[in-house]
C-alpha cells in the first residue's frame, strides 16, 4: 500500500492543496485512497471528502494514545491502495506550539510514515536547503522522504530541484504551478 504524510515547515504552505491533488491523482490511478488529518481539524477533511467522496479520518495524539491511533489508522486504511495523511501547522508544531507532542512529526513517527515536505520557494532559494536540513536534523528519525514545491514556476523548479536534491539529499518529487488570478476589488483593484 502507498502511504505517506504531507507536512510543511509552517501553515499556509499549501499542505491541503497538495494533499487533495495527490488524493485526486491516486484516485485517478485506481489506488482507492483513504485520507487522514492530524489533530481534531474538521475543515481540511471536508476538502479531502470533496475530492474522494468518502470520509476523512482524524488521528489525534492528544486525545488518543499512540496504540489507539495505530489501530484507528490500520482499520481505516485496510482494503485501500493508498493512505494519505495531512499534517497540521508546521512539521514539529505540537501542543501549545512549544512541544512536538501531537505534531505532524509525532504522527509520522507513531505510524512509521515517510513524509513529503511541502515547501514554497517564495523569496528564497539556497536558504530553503538550510531550512530543510534543519528540519531533517531536528529529530531522529525525521521521516522526511521527499520534497514537493508549491506555487512554483516551471523555470524556477528546473533551477531549484537539482540544487535542493544536492544540498539536502532528498528527492524533489514535483511541483504545483503558481496559479495567477485576476485582481479583485478587495485587493484594491479598480475597474
Predicted regions and their residues:
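ATP-dependent carboxylate-amine ligase catalytic core
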Residues: 2-17, 23-111, 119-143, 151-159
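Short hydrophobic alpha-helical runs that function as membrane-insertion/retention elements
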Residues: 115-118, 173-175
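Conserved anion/nucleotide-ligand pocket segment
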Residues: 163
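Beta-strand-loop-alpha "switch" segments that mediate conformational coupling across diverse proteins
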Residues: 169-179
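Conserved small/polar residues in nucleotide/adenosyl-binding loops
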Residues: 180-185, 189
Amino acid at each position: 500500500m502507498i502511504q505517506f504524510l504531507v507536512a510543511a515547515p509552517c501553515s499556509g504552505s499549501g499542505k491541503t492543496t497538495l494533499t487533495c491533488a495527490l488524493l485526486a491523482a491516486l484516485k485517478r490511478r485506481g489506488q482507492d485512497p483513504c485520507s487522514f488529518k492530524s489533530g481534531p481539524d474538521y475543515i481540511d477533511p471536508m476538502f479531502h471528502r470533496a475530492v474522494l467522496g468518502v470520509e476523512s479520518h482524524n488521528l489525534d495524539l492528544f486525545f488518543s494514545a499512540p496504540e489507539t491511533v495505530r489501530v484507528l489508522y490500520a482499520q481505516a486504511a485496510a482494503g485501500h491502495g493508498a493512505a494519505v495523511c495531512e499534517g497540521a501547522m508546521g512539521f514539529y508544531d505540537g501542543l501549545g506550539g512549544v512541544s512536538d507532542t501531537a505534531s505532524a512529526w509525532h504522527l509520522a513517527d507513531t505510524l512509521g510514515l515517510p513524509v513529503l515536505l511541502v515547501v514554497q520557494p517564495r523569496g528564497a532559494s539556497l536558504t530553503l536547503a538550510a531550512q530543510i536540513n534543519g528540519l531533517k536534523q531536528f529529530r531522529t528519525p525525521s521521516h522526511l522522504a521527499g520534497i514537493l514545491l508549491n506555487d512554483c514556476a516551471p523555470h524556477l523548479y528546473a533551477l531549484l530541484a537539482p540544487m535542493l536534491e544536492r544540498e539536502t539529499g532528498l528527492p524533489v518529487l514535483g511541483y504545483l504551478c503558481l496559479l495567477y488570478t485576476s485582481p479583485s476589488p478587495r485587493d484594491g483593484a479598480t475597474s
